[in-house]
C-alpha cells in the first residue's frame, strides 16, 4: 500500500500549537504521525536532534520495537498531523 494511502484512508487528524508536546520521551508508543502541515522538532534529553517538515513521518520506532518513546516530539510551529494507531499500523 502506498504511503499516501495509509494516511489518507480514514485519517485521524490532530492539531498542535507551536511549543506543544506531541509526545514525550518515556511515553508509551500508541501511534505514529505524518506531518500534514507545519514543522516538528525531535529532542533527546532537551537537545534538538531533528527538525521535520510536512510529508515527514515520525514516532514509528515505538510501534516497531514495543518500547517507550526514546525522544520528545514538539510542535515547532502550529501543526496538523495524521496519526496511525498501533492497531492500524500492524494491519498494514
Write out the residue ranges for each language-model feature.
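Regulatory nucleotide-sensing modules
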Residues: 1-45
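Cyclic-nucleotide recognition modules
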Residues: 9, 50-92
Amino acid at each position: 500500500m502506498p504511503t499516501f494511502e495509509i494516511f489518507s484512508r480514514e485519517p485521524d487528524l490532530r492539531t498542535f500549537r507551536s511549543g506543544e508536546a506531541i509526545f514525550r520521551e518515556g511515553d508509551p508508543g500508541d501511534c505514529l504521525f505524518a506531518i500534514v502541515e507545519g514543522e516538528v522538532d525531535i529532542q533527546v534529553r532537551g537537545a534538538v536532534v531533528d527538525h521535520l517538515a510536512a510529508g515527514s513521518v515520525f514516532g514509528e520506532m515505538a510501534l516497531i520495537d514495543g518500547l517507550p518513546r526514546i525522544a520528545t516530539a514538539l510542535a515547532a510551529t502550529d501543526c496538523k498531523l495524521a496519526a496511525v494507531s498501533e492497531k492500524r499500523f500492524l494491519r498494514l
